[in-house]
């Protein structure tokens, strides 16, 4: 499998390679200072029929949608970790852990991807599929 799979450490906006069938991000898009820039790079690195699998914390689009035990915990984590991390980077969009589907969809569409859907979810995470 080493001829088909590799792991690299690189900035989300400049990792190497093109023509990827699948790009995955796990619980990180909301922490990025420039998630739109990272999403644009994902789009550029994907094959024409590629897929981007985005795993993000489960969240509703409105504050009142997140007034539950998990949402409250995620707001706490977001205040302590996610938002300051994003603000400390270039652009500093600060989506936070409770960004919600609409905010993630907006990032993806602004990056030039045209198809977006919620593919799966758990009480803690939402899995989105984005395609060119």
Task: List the model feature ranges, each with a label.
Residues 1-12:
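Conserved SAM-binding strand-loop segment of SAM-dependent methyltransferases
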Residues 111-132:
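Core SAM-dependent methyltransferase catalytic element
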Residues 36-49:
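A short glycine-rich, Lys/Arg-flanked "PGG" loop and its adjoining helix->strand segment in the class I
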Residues 10-23:
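A short acidic, Gly/Pro-enriched loop at the edge of an enzyme's catalytic core
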Residues 21-36:
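A short SAM/SAH-binding and catalytic strip from SAM-dependent methyltransferases
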Residues 8, 24, 53:
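Conserved Rossmann-like nucleotide-binding pocket used by diverse enzymes
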Residues 52-53, 115:
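A short hydrophobic/small-residue beta-strand
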Residues 55-111:
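C-terminal alpha-helical "lid/dimerization" subdomain adjacent to the S-adenosyl-L-methionine
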């Amino acid at each position: 499998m080493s001829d088909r799979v590799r792991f690299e450490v690189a900035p989300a906006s400049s990792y190497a390679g093109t023509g990827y069938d699948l790009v995955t991000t796990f619980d990180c898009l909301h922490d990025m200072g420039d998630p739109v820039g990272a999403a644009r790079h994902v789009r550029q690195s994907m094959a024409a029929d590629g897929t981007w699998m985005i795993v993000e914390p489960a969240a509703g689009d409105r504050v009142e949608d997140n007034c539950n035990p998990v949402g409250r915990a995620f707001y706490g984590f977001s205040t302590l970790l996610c938002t300051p991390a994003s603000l400390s980077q270039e652009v500093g969009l600060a989506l936070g852990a409770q960004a919600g589907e609409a905010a993630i969809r907006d990032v993806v569409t602004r990056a030039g991807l045209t198809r977006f859907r919620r593919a799966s979810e758990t009480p803690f995470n939402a899995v989105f599929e984005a395609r060119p």
